[in-house]
A protein has these predicted regions:
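Extracellular/lumenal glycan-associated context and N-glycosylation machinery
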Residues: 1-87
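An amphipathic, basic-hydrophobic helix/alpha-beta surface used to engage anionic
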Residues: 3-7, 70-219
Length: 219
């Protein structure tokens, strides 16, 4: 088994995404992952230093400030998780394109809860630079987000694995989920640039195709 195959199997086991999934895709508790962001890690190191200093110098106010900030950070984990849980995803519209033009896939996100979902970002897992602008979902609403995938070959293009993430509310925690809607787009061959003109009619042929340049179609 090659390293790439092992990595693909490990990711399928870890993220529970083995290929295109039937709609609707529901983001349950087991599909959401939570880790601190770089800012969250920096804050954690700072809080650890504050705690050690408070212990060393017996600072009551230092303890209070450390645990107060730590409690706020802990609560942000809960809010980041709730921002994604129970969302439903279904594939939207994807029109055919010519090779070389980006294929645009519509993704429908359904929020059945009575609370808003804030600061969401959607992007292809293997291409984070193609991320959407941060967007919100109103309570009991459906929103459409568009993912543009570059095309290099003609034929059917399958929508790759996507990542939906949030860093709401404080940017300390990154919560995300991976999924792959069963959606594809037809990519036509690109038209030839500066193509030669079509050949003129041949007078030696009979029938309707025998008309050459300058012949009238009507008597």
């Amino acid at each position: 088994m090659s390293l790439a195959q092992f990595r693909a199997r490990f990711q399928r086991w870890l993220f529970r995404v083995g290929g295109p999934e039937p709609a609707p895709i529901r983001l349950g508790q087991r599909r959401i992952f939570v880790l601190p962001s770089r800012f969250g890690l920096a804050l954690g190191i700072t809080l650890l230093a504050m705690l050690l200093a408070s212990i060393n110098y017996t600072l009551s106010l230092g303890f209070a400030l450390t645990f107060l900030i730590g409690g706020v950070a802990w609560i942000s984990i809960h809010h980041a998780f709730r921002n994604l849980v129970d969302l439903a995803i279904t594939p939207g519209r994807s029109d055919a394109v010519f090779c070389g033009s980006p294929a645009r896939f519509g993704i429908l996100l359904h929020n059945a809860a009575h609370r808003s979902r804030l600061g969401l970002v959607l992007f292809p897992t293997q291409a984070p630079t193609l991320r959407t602008h941060p967007f919100d979902l109103s309570p009991e609403s459906t929103a459409t987000q568009e993912i543009a995938i570059p095309t290099a070959t003609r034929g059917w293009l399958t929508l790759p694995r996507l990542t939906l993430e949030t860093r709401h509310p404080l940017g300390l925690i990154r919560a995300w989920s991976l999924f792959q809607p069963d959606q594809r787009c037809l990519v036509y061959p690109a038209p030839e640039a500066d193509a030669p003109p079509l050949p003129l009619g041949d007078d030696s042929r009979s029938g309707a195709g025998a008309q050459g340049r300058g012949r009238d179609d009507f008597a």
